[in-house]
Amino acid sequence: MTEAKTGTGNERLVVEIVGAHNLMPKDGEDSSSPFVEVQFENQRLRTKVKPKDLNPIWNEKLVFHVIDVNDLRHKALEINVYNEKRSSNSRNFLGKVRVLGSSVGREGESVVQLYTLEKRSLFSSVRGEISVKHYMTTTAENGENVRRVNRSGGSKKSKKVQNVSSSMAIQQQQQQQQQQISLHNHNRGNQQQSQQNGQGQRMLPFYPHQSEIKPLVITALPSPMPGPGPRPIVYSNGSSEFSLKETKPCLGGTSNGLGGLSSHKDKTSSTYDLVEQMQYLYVNIVKAKDLSVLGEVVSEVKLGNYRGVTKKVSSNSSNPEWNQVFVFSKERIQSSVVELFVKEGNKDEYTGRVLFDLSEIPTRVPPDSPLAPQWYKIENRNGGRGNGELMVSVWFGTQADEAFAEAWHSKAGNVHIEELSSIKSKVYLSPKLWYLRISVIEAQDVAIMDKGSSLMRFPELSAKLQVGSQILRTAIASAIPTKSFSNPYWNEDLMFVVAEPFEDCVTVVVEDRLNGGAIGGQNDVAVGRVQIPISAVERRTGDTLVGSRWFSLDNGNNNNRFGSRIHLRLSLDGGYHVLDEATMYNSDVRPTAKELWKPQVGLLEIGILSATGLMPMKVRDGKCGGIADSYCVAKYGPKWVRTRTVVDSLCPKWNEQYTWEVYDPCTVVTVGVFDNARVNENNNSRDVRIGKVRIRLSTLETGRVYTHSYPLIVLHPSGVKKTGELHLAVRLSCGNAVNMLHMYALPLLPKMHYTQPLGVHMLERLRYQTLNAVAARLSRAEPPLGREVVEYMLDHDFHVWSMRRSKANFFRLVNVISGLVAVAKLVEVMRSWSKPVYSTVFVLAFLFMVLFPELLLPCLLLYTAAVGVWRFRRRSRYPPHMDARISHAETVFPDELDEEFDTFPTSRGFDVVRMRYDRVRSIAGRVQTVVGDMASQGERVQALLSWRDPRATFLFLMFCLLAAVGFYTVPVKLTVAISGLYYLRPPRFRRKLPSRGLSFFRRLPSRADSLL
């Protein structure tokens, strides 16, 4: 430990430099010799040098004296990482971190925090992260590990810090090895000894492999003393209740059983490095043999107050098999033994049992092979040897264990055994969807229905097509002179959405409408039909037309006099992307045909950590206050994930990590939180939405771990409500930077959307059919993903009229135009000459651009680039989130909310509907006026040459002729300069009346006087 002595205060600031990861090589040999230099006020301390190490571990404490603790929040720590160049006695910059003094906590409350190294200047080459712990203390640090450095001896200080004795290095290595050995030798004696020594927190070293690109995360062991541990530090992005907050959770790799990180990092731990470690006790009951039981046999696991029971097995065999896994949270274990009972049927008395001491249970760390079950002798009620044996395996593990997903959890002990499947975590896949294009061209020799009438009747023939529940109709065939009435001609394209596997058929029915009426009414009579299996339809990936075919029509009356047939062209279009989400929230834009997919450009990893402050959703007997049975659903591309349901908790912890392949960075991932209504309730109940979060991947930096608390905001008829906060850890990894940058130059949608575009109304109808297909498929899964969940995740109602959304979009447009308005105001300020110096500089710049017009575009582009570089340092470090202020959810009126939640068609009373109709009329009237004014200005431009006003057109033509002569004789530069100077002339040379040109334009006629 290094200490800087400045002053006589007792308060000390301790900065513990733990380690760094993935540093930039600077020595020319793909390595670096890093050290850390920390500066606080006028005190500067540094760690020892780690030669040839891009992932150094220091575990050194630097102590700074604080004169005024109250002034600490106005100061900052400067942490710089350098590479030591021994040959030239100089150093290279590797990165820096600036820590505000307001974020420094007290001793015992701080945790190790991971900081991303920042650049010192624009051209600095920096990468990597550094793990630092900082806190205030009043305890004097004494011992042989403390090195005191005087501020006055600058050169001596450097020599003392750099020249670390070899005995000290060997001693630190021995201490690190002892810590690693103590991690693997987990027993109670070590815990009791740590309690006697009064250790609050111990830092464990972590040695990652240099080839891995995962961020270094070092966590602190929880205090062995009773009581809750330190909470993660939270940094708010604003004072609003609906703001985004940055968190610092203890993320890590494989746990060693003591709550820390092991010194190695394996494949499984790297796949769970975005979640917090959760320790569990696993009990796997496989089977039994040689039991002397007459009735049905069950096995029971008892751990303190927790009790889990297996399914009943028939007594036909003396060797029953269960193959069930029970999981108990280690943080809630209140017993020293776990008991396994074998019972007969529903009897309370057991026939035998097996006991395990928790201190002797091993710890399994993936990717170790599963623990092999063993046979254990069953004890009778008297403690003697009973009849039979029980095959079980018991071990400690984490949520990374393979048995975790399908196991019975102790927190779900109150859930009925038949409902356990509805609370498990699952991964779903959306069905592979295709657009089915059917071109109804024509029909021949259709049997026309005359209904016994002697009068000549013109048939009204149309075609009805049905695929599953989707029904579309063509228009009534129009009369063509070259074709008879029995040969109708339509030539219409109809689109359907179908899902693999193709089990449905296309039913084509030719109908004749009798006695008038609407199409599809009771007067339509089928005159022929044909069924075509979808599996026989030809697939296409481009815009090349497939061949058309003739199909025979069955008229149903065995009348062979007419050989009716219909001409169709059917194709499964794989070149389109079947839209199931709103265009602005697309999570996948790939076409259906796999051969058209672009290569993968990255990997998206999301750690769903926990939720806090959830709103109670139900009241359950025996529970004080409301509770919630919450789970999360994340959707990106065709992959849906569902976390397990945490029962009876308003602050659930999931700590589940999922991965998606990224094919386009300009996509959005959606994470929703729901209350499981199927837990101890009616299975037909609908899950209640709690809130959701959208994250656009293009706003994320590659390789950076984003740990934030996202507000869950739901709009109710009574107003906007915050229903809780969702804690996520998100990382976007880039496999090939060139491919990712190349994606920005490609069209957003596949080629077919531009060569053969679909109409807006058709896309909306197809999107609704796609939603039905996805919801129907996911609702048949186990556990089912309800339709209400699918609709909420896919934003099925984003197109519904809302006064609130209209205001939000209007002010978004105003915000976009505000830049142009600001430029116009700036020019007006220059014209007003209220600031003569600025106006003079502006005029000189204008004349410079007139004299050298070839510099105009380069200067403009250079200025744009400079603005972008200047804004880089002030860029937002937080990903965008749902903003209640931008959505105008905080200032919306109650009646506008009630209108937004109204059904379609409306279900409100007459007076309410009339009031809303009058309000819409008032708004539409103002819009109508603005549109009319814009049309009038355009019509005045057209009137310049229309001779509607002969005198105005004559004057305009004379002006054009004179202007042509003037522009031909006078140089362009001189013309532009004179025009600009005339426009920028001081106010004393201007008059307040409108210009003659503007007055002339306003006198031109428009078509407004022709309106009724």
From Swiss-Prot:
Keyword Transcription applies: no
Residues engaged in binding Ca(2+) 2: E344, N346, E349
Superkingdom per UniProt: Eukaryota
SUPFAM superfamilies, A to Z: C2 domain (Calcium/lipid-binding domain, CaLB)
Record's function text: May function as a signaling molecule by regulating the trafficking of other regulators.
Region of interest called Disordered, as start-end residue ranges on this chain: 141-203
CC per GO annotation: endoplasmic reticulum membrane
Cofactor: Ca(2+)
Start-end of Low complexity biased regions: 161-180, 188-202
Underlying gene: MCTP10
Record key words, sorted: Calcium, Endoplasmic reticulum, Membrane, Metal-binding, Repeat, Transmembrane, Transmembrane helix
Keyword Oxidoreductase in record: no
Tissue: Highly expressed in roots meristems, shoot apical meristems (SAMs) and in incipient leaf primordia. Observed in flowers.
Name of this chain's protein: Multiple C2 domain and transmembrane region protein 10
Binding site for Ca(2+) 1: E296, E344, N346
GO molecular function: metal ion binding
UniProt organism field: Arabidopsis thaliana (Mouse-ear cress)
